[in-house]
Swiss-Prot record:
One of its GO terms (molecular function) is RNA binding. The gene is matK. This is Maturase K. InterPro entries: Domain_X, Maturase_MatK, Maturase_MatK_N. It comes from the Eukaryota.
C-alpha cells in the first residue's frame, strides 16, 4: 500500500483522480492476489504464479465485458462469487480478483485526497480503544435528557453511490466501470447482506465494506450541516477523514474520532448540547432539550434520508429514549442513567452552606444472562449454567487449551471492566475455569481432582495464574463497587456487541 502511495505522488493521473489507467497495472493485481488469498482457506495452494492469471489483454477484455453488459444480462460477474474457488481459475474467481484491485485503487486514491488536509492540522493524538466511547458517555451523556437511537438506512440505489464518487473521480471511464459494477452489487445493502458485512468480517468482501463506509461517510458529512442549521450555529466546524484509522482531534466545539476495528468504524462528535456516537449501523445522538426539539431532529433526519438518498426510512429505525426512564443496549452493555443526589458543603467564613445537586449517574451493566446463553451456544456450559467439557478442543495440546480459556476469560473481564455488576462476572470465570478442567480431564481420561492435583499440572499455575492477577485487579472484591475502570487496550468488541436480540 505504501508503494502505491509513493507511486501516486509521482504521477499526476492519480493525484488528479484519473484512475482508469491504473486498472491495468500488474503490480496492483499482485496486491489484490495477496488479499484474495488471505480470504481463502489455508488448504489452498499459495505457490500459484500471478503471471499465470493476470495480463493486460485479459484484464482489458474483462473490463470491456463488464461495461457492455446490462441488467438483463445473466453473466453476473460479481454476483454470488465464491471466494474459495480460486483453484478452479473460473470467471468468478478472476472477476473477484479484478474487484479486489479496483477496491485497492479506490481506497488509496481516497486516502491521498484527504492526506493534504490532515497534514495541515496539528495536535493529532492516536487512541485505539473502543472504551473511549464509554468514557465519553460517562462524562457527557448524564447532562442530556434524551437519546435518539438511530439505525442507518441500508437500502440505497447504486446511482447515489455513483453521484458520491463523481465528486472525487474525474474520468468518465472509471465512473462507467463503477456504475456497471455497482448495479451488479445492487443487492449488497439488503438486510441479510448487511448483517453479513457487519458481523462476520471473514465472510465479507472488501469492496462491500468500502461502499458501506463511503455511504456512511456521506450520511455523516451532511448530518453535521443539518445539526448546524438546526441549532443555528455558525461556529461548528467539521473535518472527516475516512482513510485515517486512529486519531482524535478537537476542533473548537466538535470532536471527531474515527476508529477502525476489524471492519467497522467508530465516530464521536461533540457539541455543547449534542453528543453523537456511532458503531457500525447503530448511532446514538444525546440531546439536552425538550421532547419537541428531539422530535424535530428526527423529522429532519427523515427528510434528509428521503430527499437526498431517495429512500424511505422506517420510523422504528429512529427511537427516542428518555434517559431517566429507560435503559438501552449498546456495544454489549445495558446502559442506564439513574438520578442521584449529591450533597455539597461549602465553607464561607463562618457560614456553612449545604446544597443538594441532582445529577444522572451512568450505569453500564454486563448482560450476564446473554453471556451465559453465549457460553451455552459455544458448548462451555449447558442450558442450566453447569460447566461442561469442550470436546472440540480435546485434540489440542494442554498449553493451547489453557491459553484459549485464559484468553477468553481475560478478554471478557477486560471488556466489561467498567460495569457496575462486577461480582456477577466471577460466576462466568468459574464456568470457564471448571470447563477448562473438565476439558483436560476428558482429554486425559481422568477426573477433575486428578488433573488439578497431578504433579506438574499447570491448570492453576499457568492459566489464571498469579502473574496475571493484575488483569483482574479491577474486579477485586475489596474494591469499592463505585469505582469504575475502563481498560484502554480493547481493540475488538465482545461478540455480544453485534447481537441486537437481547434476552433480558
Amino acid at each position: 500500500m505504501d508503494e502505491f502511495q509513493r507511486y501516486g505522488n509521482k504521477h499526476k493521473s492519480w493525484q488528479q483522480c484519473f484512475l482508469y489507467p491504473l486498472f491495468f497495472r500488474e503490480d496492483l493485481y499482485t496486491i489484490a492476489h495477496d488479499l484474495y488469498l488471505d480470504k481463502s482457506s489455508s488448504s489452498e495452494p499459495t505457490e500459484l504464479s500471478i503471471s499465470n492469471f493476470f495480463s493486460f489483454p485479459t484484464v482489458k477484455r474483462l473490463i470491456r465485458r463488464i461495461r457492455q453488459q446490462n441488467d438483463s444480462n445473466s453473466i453476473g460477474l460479481f454476483r454470488n462469487c465464491d471466494p474459495n474457488r480460486f483453484i478452479n481459475r473460473n470467471r468468478n474467481s478472476y472477476s473477484e480478483l479484478v474487484l479486489e484491485g479496483l477496491t485497492v485503487i479506490l481506497e488509496v486514491s481516497l486516502a491521498m485526497q484527504s492526506k493534504h488536509f490532515i497534514e495541515g492540522m496539528d495536535g493529532w493524538k492516536s487512541i485505539r480503544s473502543i472504551h473511549c466511547i464509554f468514557t465519553l458517555m460517562e462524562d457527557k451523556f448524564p447532562y442530556s435528557n434524551y437519546v435518539s437511537d438511530i439505525r442507518v438506512p441500508y437500502s440505497i440505489h447504486p446511482e447515489i453511490l455513483v453521484r458520491t464518487f463523481r465528486r472525487w473521480i474525474r474520468d468518465a471511464p472509471s465512473l462507467h466501470l463503477l456504475r456497471s459494477i455497482l448495479h451488479e452489487w445492487r443487492n449488497s445493502f439488503s438486510a441479510e447482506n448487511l448483517q453479513k458485512a457487519l458481523v462476520p468480517p471473514r465472510e465479507n468482501r472488501r469492496f462491500s465494506l468500502f461502499l458501506w463506509n463511503s455511504y456512511v461517510y456521506e450520511c455523516e458529512s451532511f448530518l453535521v450541516s443539518l445539526l448546524k442549521q438546526f441549532y443555528h450555529s455558525r461556529s461548528l466546524l467539521y473535518g472527516s477523514f475516512p482513510d485515517r484509522t486512529h486519531f482524535d482531534k478537537k476542533i473548537k466545539h466538535i470532536i471527531i474520532f474515527p476508529v477502525k476495528i476489524s471492519t467497522k468504524r467508530i465516530w464521536l462528535l461533540k457539541y455543547p448540547f449534542i453528543y453523537y456516537v456511532r458503531y457500525g449501523e447503530r448511532s446514538l445522538i444525546a440531546l439536552k432539550g425538550t421532547h419537541l426539539q428531539v422530535k424535530r431532529c428526527r423529522y429532519h433526519l427523515f427528510n434528509f434520508w428521503q430527499y437526498y438518498f431517495h429512500l424511505w426510512s422506517q420510523p422504528y429505525r429512529v427511537c427516542i429514549l428518555e434517559l431517566s426512564k429507560i435503559y438501552f443496549y449498546f456495544l454489549g452493555h445495558f446502559l442506564s442513567f439513574k438520578m442521584k443526589t449529591l450533597v455539597v458543603r461549602t465553607k464561607m467564613l463562618d457560614d456553612l452552606l449545604i446544597s443538594d445537586i441532582i445529577a444522572n449517574e451512568f450505569n453500564p451493566i454486563a448482560p450476564i444472562r446473554s453471556i451465559l446463553l453465549y457460553l451455552t451456544k459455544e458448548r462451555f456450559c449447558d442450558i442450566s449454567g453447569q460447566p461442561i467439557s469442550r470436546l472440540s478442543w480435546t485434540n489440542l495440546s494442554d498449553d493451547d487449551i489453557l491459553d484459549r480459556f485464559d484468553r477468553m476469560c481475560r478478554n471478557l473481564f477486560h471488556y466489561y471492566s467498567g460495569s457496575i455488576n462486577k461480582d456477577s462476572l466471577y460466576h462466568i470465570k468459574y464456568i470457564l475455569l471448571l470447563s477448562c478442567a473438565k476439558t483436560l480431564a476428558c482429554k486425559h481420561k481422568s477426573t477433575i481432582r486428578l488433573v488439578r492435583e497431578e504433579p506438574g499440572s499447570e491448570l492453576f499455575t499457568k492459566s489464571f495464574s498469579k502473574e496475571r492477577e493484575f488483569i483482574y485487579s479491577s474486579f477485586s472484591k475489596t474494591r469499592s463497587q463505585r469505582e469504575r475502570i475502563w481498560n484502554s487496550d480493547i481493540l475488538q468488541i465482545n461478540p455480544l456487541a453485534n447481537s441486537y436480540t437481547i434476552n433480558k
